[in-house]
Amino acid sequence: MSCNLRVLGCSGGISSDLRTTSLLLNDNILIDAGTGVGDLSLDELRKIDYVFLTHSHLDHICSIPFIADAVGGSRDKPLKVYGIYETIHALQEHIFNNVIWPDFTKIPTPKNPFISLHLIDVGEKTKVGNINITALPVDHSISANGYAVDSGAGTLVFSGDTSVSDAFWKAVNQQHQVKHVIIETSFLDQEEALAIVSGHLSPSLLVKELDKLDSIACHPDLQIWVCHLKPDGGDAIMQEIEVLSQSAKLKPQKLNRNTTLEF
């Protein structure tokens, strides 16, 4: 059975037509919960049962409190939020702490909260219906992970935020029928030092990273999608990627809001 992914947001920042990272799988699963979630209707928000987080930076988690506030009272079960220890701990300590936001992991009651938090480990596979979601290792400025989403018909890989990472590609190369790879590139080549220190990629680094992808793991129609472009440099970043990829087999494309991917 195939799976559909709808891109609610994939930018490294905001503007009138840009939203931060939020990917909707089959109407009921979110990967990250950035500002793109705010474009969903109340009925669409109520359908979301699971959120899988890549890390705790604000542009990836900011809509979780608002989902609970908007539709928690009209749902009959908690919103299940998954993440590695550092991500879940950050939510508990810094968001749902009754200072920044009410603790919806205990509201309206500890036994029946609007939100439940669930720990996962890198390498761990979580089954949601017919979909298997595996946390992948990455290298960011804080503890983080990517995801491989296996529908049975194909696999989509999402890097989340990462810099150069051999471990990520080793894990990707263990997947099957990889049809889509969504990977970040946040900075221009002239800002490569900043990209590295902040745990991100530049165009040159991206092209080198893609050389680590083993074709044996890939679907014949593999597509590479670039996300997390900084708003004031996105077009220039894609231009650099296009030039660097002229002689490469893989031709990365810009991921846009409202794109739908099937796998």
Predicted regions and their residues:
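Conserved beta-strand hairpin/beta-sheet module of binuclear metal-dependent hydrolase folds
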Residues: M1-E44, A144-D161
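Structural motif
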Residues: I29, Y50, I131, G154-L156, ...
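Active-site metal-binding motif and surrounding structural segment of the metallo-beta-lactamase
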Residues: V37-G83, V178-K179
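Short amphipathic alpha-helix with an adjacent loop that forms part of the alpha/beta core around
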Residues: L40-L45, T126-G129, W169-Q174, D211, ...
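Short helix-terminating capping/connector loops at secondary-structure junctions
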Residues: S74-K77, I107-P113, I216-L222
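Metallo-beta-lactamase
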Residues: T87-A144, G152, Q246-E262
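Cap/insert and terminal regions of metallo-dependent hydrolase folds
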Residues: S165-N258
